[in-house]
């Protein structure tokens, strides 16, 4: 597999509420699965608090490393919602009143109900393009390879669905799984030896109660099946009865 064909992404989760433990993130799993379905690998997830400099630093690092960056959180009306301003500064752009976003807010709340806090949500980086948000009025946006979205899972998911048409499709990854009633330590050496033969295949070992799940992932399905069969044969030689499930 040519590495130039691999499309990668990073996720930046923004919010003190995540770091304090008050809120449990529900967006990582959704994003990872949906990106994978489009042949895009989620390669890194970072969490930062509501600090402008930290957001700017993280966004600038991630957008240089990956094809796409998704952010969640911090685009609401309160004083600690500083994502839009931070993204603007990361791109050296002014934060301006986006007329389209402003009209959306007026349609949602009514012109007489647009106070300073709500108007704040219409201020976006100068070159931002809006992401559709059919759930609420808070606008998400895209600027270059960065997609800025809400932290609330239902809204995050809706914004992602709206952004999918703008993503390039990568080479989809295949996966196989072997569940066995052995501890990791028993098969660790065999797995290490096999991994050294197949550098293009990701081999993971994940313990559960009374067993281990071996997960093989790769872009080349033929090579993946070859490596997986070798592992299966190694386990069978130990004792075929220890195989719980093959997926």
What are these regions (language model features)?
Residues 54-57, 64, 82-168:
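Proline/glycine-rich low-complexity loops and linkers
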Residues 14-16, 71-79, 150, 218-219:
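Glycine-rich beta-strand-to-loop/alpha-helix junction loops that act as flexible
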Residues 2-45, 50, 225:
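Glycine-rich phosphate/diphosphate-binding loop of Rossmann-like nucleotide-binding domains
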Residues 29-82, 86-89:
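N-terminal small/polar loop signature for handling phosphorylated ligands or for N-terminal nucleophile
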Residues 145-236:
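An accessory alpha-helical subdomain
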Residues 181-185, 242-247:
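Short proline/glycine- and acidic-rich turn/helix-capping motifs at secondary-structure junctions
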